């Protein structure tokens, strides 16, 4: 059973603070191993990829190509149930339409003395998309990463995916085709991240790597950062639901379990001002757990990291929500807009009782790649902005240079940078 906390209790702050800092990921010191793998790929290229793919995934690249062929992608698309294809296509259309609204515009202007200033946006040239294998291989995540990159104008999107024995989940390949991703390699782990960052004989390097993975992938992304950009280091999923008494406990229980079934380290939290509702939701969770195919995972998540928090009034939930900074925040209350106006920290907000977080996972149009582990305090979910970069523009004519030069020269001299000062003064006094 999840922990029960009451805001009115004398020891609430102590218990809540401890709850916030509970570690939900198994700590695995893989940095040394990952460093060795990255160095091996940098030095041996394809040979290293073949070695690790054989060792970890049982793939023999003398029997199957490293790159997934166009025929394989087409065959996978044909093999996937038509209803799934149509759902993926609907999701892709909605993601594309929403993310197109995020495209920033160039802003070039002239100030009051005639200096041209502004910024210009350009797409990153090449992006690598890591797609996990196994039970965490989600076609929807392919769309959430690839479609915004396409909208941004990224010319080359490279997908890597672990393939046990060489086989890739057909739905993942179908999603890639729908998103317009054609360059796909059946490699995974730290070795795939290294190949994307540094390149091999077969794989040209990219400029940025996005997508979640296990501890080895996360460590590899950390280690190659600086050589390439990365999106974020994703942790276990989480949801916070703020609910008043006028809710169906079964609805709320289903929402909490939708996160809990992801991972034993996932976290589901309910904050309510009604004790009876809190107890009813707890009971509903226990009933619904018996219906789930992933009940063992969900039960462990709920027991180890779940919480029901009772507050005296709904506005008391606001500071708690901002401290939790949840990946997903549902506002299942009569006036969700009033609460939302005061929420500063959340990866995504789902407004009203009829907006389950799961719609955002799939077909809402918003992105489901969101900051976890309280990182919504300082970061945002994946968007078009992750695939573009801003370049500053500055333009002066002779008159503008004459007006600004004295101050620039003064500051350069004050910092002891004579060449800086001369770079300006030589344009005013060519003989100097």
Swiss-Prot record:
GO terms for biological process: L-histidine biosynthetic process. InterPro entries: Ald_DH/histidinol_DH, Histidinol_DH_CS, Histidinol_DH_monofunct, Hstdl_DH. Substrate binds at residues 237, 259, 262, 328, 361, 415, 420. NAD(+) binds at residues 130, 191, 214. Its EC number is 1.1.1.23. One of its GO terms (cellular component) is cytosol. The active site is at residues 327-328. Belongs to the histidinol dehydrogenase family. HAMAP family: HisD. This is Histidinol dehydrogenase. The lineage of its organism: Bacteria, Pseudomonadati, Pseudomonadota, Alphaproteobacteria, Hyphomicrobiales.
């Amino acid at each position: 059973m999840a922990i029960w906390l009451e805001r009115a209790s004398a020891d609430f702050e102590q218990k809540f603070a401890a709850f916030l800092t509970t570690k939900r990921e198994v700590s695995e010191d893989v940095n040394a191993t990952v460093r060795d793998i990255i160095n091996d790929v940098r030095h041996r290229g394809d040979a290293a990829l073949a070695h690790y793919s054989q060792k970890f995934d049982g793939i023999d690249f003398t029997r199957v190509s490293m790159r997934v062929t166009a025929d394989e992608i087409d065959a996978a698309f044909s093999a996937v149930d038509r209803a799934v294809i149509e759902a993926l296509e609907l999701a892709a259309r909605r993601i594309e339409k929403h993310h197109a609204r995020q495209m920033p515009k160039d802003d070039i202007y002239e100030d009051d003395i005639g200096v041209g200033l502004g910024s210009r946006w350009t797409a990153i040239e090449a992006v690598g998309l890591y797609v996990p294998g196994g039970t965490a291989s989600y076609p929807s995540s392919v769309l959430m990463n690839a479609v915004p990159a396409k909208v941004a104008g990224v010319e080359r999107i490279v997908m890597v995916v672990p393939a046990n024995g060489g086989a890739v989940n057909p739905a993942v390949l179908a999603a890639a085709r729908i998103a317009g991703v054609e360059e796909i390699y059946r490699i995974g782990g730290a070795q795939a991240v290294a190949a994307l960052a540094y390149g091999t004989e077969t794989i040209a390097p990219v400029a940025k790597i996005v997508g979640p993975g296990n501890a080895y992938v996360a460590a590899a992304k950390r280690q190659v950062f600086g050589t390439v950009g990365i999106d974020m280091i994703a942790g276990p999923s989480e949801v916070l639901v703020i609910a008043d008494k006028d809710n169906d406990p079964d609805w709320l229980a289903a929402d909490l379990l939708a996160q809990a079934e992801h991972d034993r380290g996932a976290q589901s939290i309910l904050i309510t001002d009604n004790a009876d509702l809190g107890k009813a939701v707890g009971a509903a969770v226990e009933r619904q757990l018996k219906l789930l195919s992933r009940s063992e995972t969900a039960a462990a998540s709920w027991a180890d990291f779940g919480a029901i928090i009772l507050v005296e009034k709904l506005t008391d939930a606001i500071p708690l929500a901002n401290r939790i900074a949840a990946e997903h925040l549902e506002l299942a209350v009569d006036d969700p807009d009033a609460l939302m106006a005061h929420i500063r920290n959340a990866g995504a907000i789902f407004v009203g009782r009829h907006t389950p977080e799961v719609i955002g996972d799939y077909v809402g149009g918003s992105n489901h790649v969101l900051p976890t582990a309280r990182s919504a305090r300082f970061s945002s979910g994946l968007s078009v902005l992750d695939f573009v970069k801003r370049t500053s523009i500055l333009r002066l004519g002779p008159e503008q240079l004459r007006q600004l030069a004295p101050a620039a020269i003064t500051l350069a001299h004050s910092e002891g940078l004579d060449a800086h000062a001369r770079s300006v003064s030589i344009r005013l006094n060519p003989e100097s």
